[in-house]
Amino acid sequence: MADFVGSWKYGHSENMEAYLKKIGVSSDMVDKILNAKPEFTFTLEGNKMTIKMVSSLKTKITTFTFGEEFEEETPDGKKVMTKVTKDSESKMTQVIKGPECITEVVREVVGDKMIATWTVGDVKAVTTLLKA
């Protein structure tokens, strides 16, 4: 998991608007999220990871233990249950159970890029972060 540790800046995304609409985000909030251009800092302490996201919308800090389900809040204020598992030192899978749907997010570090693939039903979006 050491591959994730450090600072990451937003690179680009593909099909994120369709994904956000599929999970029930309002049109107004979709526009705000798409223009937020977040930066992330990942830290690791034992089996706990902390992800700090700073964007024009807000700052969000999420700390979790791999393999344990926890409650978190989405950017549009919905409460969801989330579980993150380690797939390898450079890959993790997050399952988000929300009121309308279940989303799977697979994050993988490849060189100086972190590629996150967001899947809900038949809709898939990809976000690429660049090592800062």
UniProtKB/Swiss-Prot annotation:
Task: List the Pfam families hit by this protein, alphabetically.
Answer: Lipocalin
SUPFAM superfamilies in UniProt: Lipocalins
Task: Give the modified residues of type N-acetylalanine.
Answer: A2
The species this protein belongs to is Fasciola hepatica
The molecular function terms in GO held by this entry are: lipid binding
Disulphide connectivity of cysteines: none
Protein name according to UniProt: Fatty acid-binding protein Fh15
Question: Acetylation among the record's keywords?
Answer: yes
The record's similarity note reads: Belongs to the calycin superfamily. Fatty-acid binding protein (FABP) family.
Ordered alphabetically, the record's keywords are: Acetylation, Lipid-binding, Transport
Superkingdom assignment: Eukaryota
